[in-house]
A protein has these predicted regions:
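Short helix-loop "hinge" at the ATP-lid/N-box region of the Bergerat-fold HATPase_c
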Residues: 93-94
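Short alpha-helical segment of the dimerization/phosphotransfer core of two-component systems
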Residues: 13-21
Length: 194
């Protein structure tokens, strides 16, 4: 039997909303279980960044985004959570970038802290939203976010993961030429506990 165009549109919308709700539920469950995850893995960041770039290559290629990385560092923490944090930051930088833009991850060791800077060439984040973007469900541009998928929890999850590791995350720089998000993490759990 043929489906009427209105019915097909309704079914497509229903499927999209179901997928969005499923993703939101999964993310909320992840956030509620963060504190139970052991943070005892030895993590080499450069290979992890390369893995994230490989995982996000189809999205970057679709948007004509160049992925670059520089530096390395080793830390103690949850391999799974640090991967998720870097993945979310990189994915956002790709999704909200300009066509033919660049996403660059730079890792430096500064006074027993690893500083990971994720820089893009997107349109920037208005100053009044730079702290709010780490709150659950916050979106700078609600219509654009819906086009790009997601449920408004990615950066909130980033903030939670960084806090769990004794670090901080902030918008270091943002203008119409792009944004740099800086994540500062202790290199070991002893530093976290001080």
């Amino acid at each position: 039997p043929e489906v009427l165009p209105e019915t097909a549109d309704f079914l497509r919308l229903l499927r999209e909303q179901t997928e969005r709700m499923t993703q939101m539920t999964k993310t909320l469950l992840e956030m509620s279980e963060l504190k139970t995850v052991p943070c005892t893995d030895r993590i080499e960041l450069a290979p992890m960044v390369e893995e994230i770039f490989a995982d996000l290559a189809p999205l970057a290629d679709r948007n004509c985004i160049i992925l670059e990385s520089e530096g390395d560092g080793v830390m103690i923490g949850s391999d799974t959570l640090i991967y998720r944090m870097l993945f979310n930051l990189t994915e956002n930088s790709i999704r909200y970038n300009r066509p033919n833009g660049t996403v660059r991850i730079m890792i430096t060791d500064e006074k027993n802290r690893l500083v990971i800077r994720v820089t893009d060439t997107g349109c920037g984040i208005p100053e009044k939203y730079r702290e709010s973007i780490f709150q659950p469900f916050f979106r700078v541009d609600k219509s654009r976010s819906r086009e790009n998928g997601g449920v408004g929890l990615g950066l909130s999850l980033v903030w939670e993961i960084v806090a769990l590791h004794g670090g901080e995350v902030l918008i270091e720089e943002s203008s119409e030429k792009g944004t740099t998000v800086a994540v500062k993490l202790p290199t070991d759990m002893k530093t976290k506990l001080l």
